[in-house]
């Protein structure tokens, strides 16, 4: 909605100088990437949090004398299906593109954008996005390969 409102506010006549400015695929598709991340969050929360909080289908387990819902069972069941593992890994790829653009844009918004610091900021931002997404993707892959029957 924000992207659509911004386009309407600009009108038909472009006011920005765009010649010679290169932009990444991620920067041109932030609305799509944000929508896909929202879709993933809704699926993820529905699959785990709602089942844990309000579902009665999870088996119970006793930990330190306290009976609790077995969330490990839910995670292992979910990540035993290849299509769900692929969905989670692709979602982390979407998150990667979103973060790579978002981190550098955040520094630019704060006014930290010059020839000296920008390449280092982009490198650290890309590295951070890669490590975060690698960590998120590792969980479903590990469950699928090593912990499911």
Question: What positions do the PLM features span?
Answer:
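Membrane-embedded alpha-helical bundles that constitute the cytochrome b-like, heme-associated redox core
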Residues: 1-149
């Amino acid at each position: 909605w924000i992207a659509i409102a911004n386009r309407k506010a600009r009108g038909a006549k472009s006011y920005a100088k765009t010649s010679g400015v290169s932009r990444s695929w991620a920067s041109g598709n932030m609305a799509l990437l944000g929508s896909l991340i929202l879709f993933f969050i809704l699926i993820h929360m529905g699959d785990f949090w709602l089942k844990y909080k309000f579902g009665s289908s999870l088996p119970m387990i006793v930990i330190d004398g306290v009976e609790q819902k077995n969330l490990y069972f839910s995670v292992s069941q979910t990540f035993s299906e290849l299509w769900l593992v692929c969905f989670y890994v692709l979602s982390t790829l979407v998150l990667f593109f979103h973060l790579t653009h978002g981190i550098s844009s955040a520094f630019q918004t704060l006014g930290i954008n010059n020839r000296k610091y920008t390449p280092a900021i982009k490198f650290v931002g890309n590295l951070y996005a890669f490590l975060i997404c690698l960590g998120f993707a590792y969980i479903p892959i590990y469950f699928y390969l090593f912990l499911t029957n």
